[in-house]
């Protein structure tokens, strides 16, 4: 929490002289705060601190009553790069949404559209999903990679609807 607050304060201070292209950083930290408000521990970890970070940009682990942690791996992610940070936070936040929803964020009927959009806008993601994931993980990761392509306002809205407004 202390690391998150320090990093957020430094980022917001930098934004006071930043260009408009860095606006996504505000949304990334807004989304991190929303994630934290669900009770999820949010952490920004270097590889030397977190063995699970090696080779990953980030990860989310949820085991009911055992573990609920969202991590951005700072050795692989330049947290000062707006796009890079947003991609990781939006992707991993989708897994938080999936945990809140007990499965996919959107109805399974939308998956073909999700895959078509990935093939059209981010064919490297479509190929990665096809080669690396199997079973239910395919659909879960497709949603997460698709979420990276969405405007920040949409991701924030999806998160709010899925995790914060759901009773």
Please annotate each region the language model reported.
Residues 25-26, 79-88, 134-142:
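Soluble non-cytosolic domains of exported or imported proteins
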Residues 14-20:
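C-terminal segment of classical bacterial N-terminal signal peptides
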Residues 32, 86, 90, 94, ...:
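Non-transmembrane alpha-helical segments in soluble domains
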Residues 93-110:
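Catalytic Zn2+-binding segment of zinc metalloproteases
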Residues 1-8:
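Bacterial N-terminal signal peptides that target proteins for export
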Residues 22-45:
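Short N-terminal segments immediately surrounding and downstream of signal-peptide cleavage
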Residues 30, 107-167:
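Metalloprotease/metallohydrolase-associated module, dominated by Zn2+-dependent proteases
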Residues 50-86, 99-100:
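Active-site scaffold of zinc-dependent metalloenzymes
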């Amino acid at each position: 929490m202390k690391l998150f607050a320090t990093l957020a304060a430094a980022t917001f201070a930098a934004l006071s002289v930043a260009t408009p292209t860095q606006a996504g950083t505000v949304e990334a930290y807004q989304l991190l705060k929303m994630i934290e408000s669900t009770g999820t521990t949010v952490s920004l970890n270097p590889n030397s601190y977190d063995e699970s970070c090696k080779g990953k940009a980030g990860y989310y682990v949820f085991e009911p009553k055992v573990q609920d942690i969202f991590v951005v791996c700072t050795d692989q992610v330049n947290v000062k790069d707006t796009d890079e940070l947003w991609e990781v936070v939006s992707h991993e936040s989708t897994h938080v949404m999936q945990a809140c929803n007990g499965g996919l964020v959107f109805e399974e009927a939308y998956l073909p559209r999700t895959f078509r959009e990935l093939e059209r806008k981010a064919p490297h993601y479509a190929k990665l999903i096809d080669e690396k994931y199997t079973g239910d993980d395919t659909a879960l990761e497709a949603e997460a990679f698709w979420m990276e392509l969405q405007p920040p306002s949409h991701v924030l809205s999806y998160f709010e609807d899925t995790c914060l407004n759901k009773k």
